[in-house]
Amino acid sequence: MKTTPVTFEDLQSSVIAVPPLCRNKNLSLAKSQNSRLIKHMHKGGIRTLLYGGNANLYNIAPSEYHSLLKMLVKISPEDMWIVPSVGPMYGTAMDQAKILREFAFPTAMLLPTLFPSKPAGVATAIRHFVEKSGMKAVLYIKDAAYITPELAAELVNDGLISWIKYAIVEPDPKKDPYLKKLIKLVDPKLIVSGIGEQPSIIHLRDFGVTGFTAGCVCIAPSRSTALLNAILKKDWATAEAIREEFVALEDLRNAHSPILVLHHAVELAGIAQTGPVLPLLTALPDKLLPKIEKAAKALLAKNA
């Protein structure tokens, strides 16, 4: 596992994959299957993994957190940067901060929640986490009510933030008042588009952010990598053509659950056995699985 400090070059050199977490039938961590998924992504050019919402870390038992981190360290290639998540609740994040001190992860992300939280309280939680863990935090902005651009900028200016995962969904990503304000207050080099391949072109081209996170990259890592490279080369026609390849699976994720569709898609495509879904979530209805399988396999076929 890569343990060097976070740099702009790191953020821009790889799509930041946000994978599901594979589990055995008894809900224990499936080391071999998680390793298999990581190898698939690594082969496709991915060098940064973010374990967060798609890994359903919202519902992980605090008693399992140390085992999760230990597993990720063991199965990750030496040149791969792993970003675990903490929280979303304050007490959970503080306990996880102590555990993180036992490892060499360069940064960790606080999972967002709107209830019960207030923007000033979120900022305080970030400060406490950084102090207790000894590492900078990834700030995940998923809703405008979570934290203000001004508070986010204060955290950045105080040297507490490694990077920002920006994921507020707008009907038209070109018209994004929050992001427009954020990039005036924070260096766009520290901001990563956090909504997958679909708005990545607009976010990088029009707002100047550094890179993007994605879930469907777990299916077709080489294609998502090609998309990032095309954007960085300003080859917009190629980038748009590649972006279209992800639409079918992304539409299913948006319609039925980004987390659950990806969880099923990885297994149905034959990449790795993701296993059962950890409660409070649950598996999608069987009637949806053929559509997910078709879209996942079609996308995987383009990855060759």
Segments predicted by a language model, with ranges:
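Active-site beta->alpha loop and helix N-cap motifs at the rims of alpha/beta catalytic domains
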Residues: 2-147
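C-terminal alpha-helical cap/extension of soluble enzyme domains
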Residues: 2-6, 16-21, 40, 44-45, ...
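A general structural signal for well-ordered alpha-helical segments in protein cores
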Residues: 34, 65, 69, 93, ...
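N-terminal cationic-hydrophobic initiation segments that often serve targeting/anchoring roles
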Residues: 42, 73, 101, 130, ...
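Short Asp/Glu-rich motifs
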Residues: 60-61, 119-120, 149, 175, ...
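Short helix-capping segments at alpha-helix termini
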Residues: 74-80, 103, 133-135, 158-161, ...
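Glycine-rich phosphate-binding "P-loop"
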Residues: 113, 166, 278
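Catalytic alpha/beta core domains of metabolic enzymes, predominantly
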Residues: 143-256
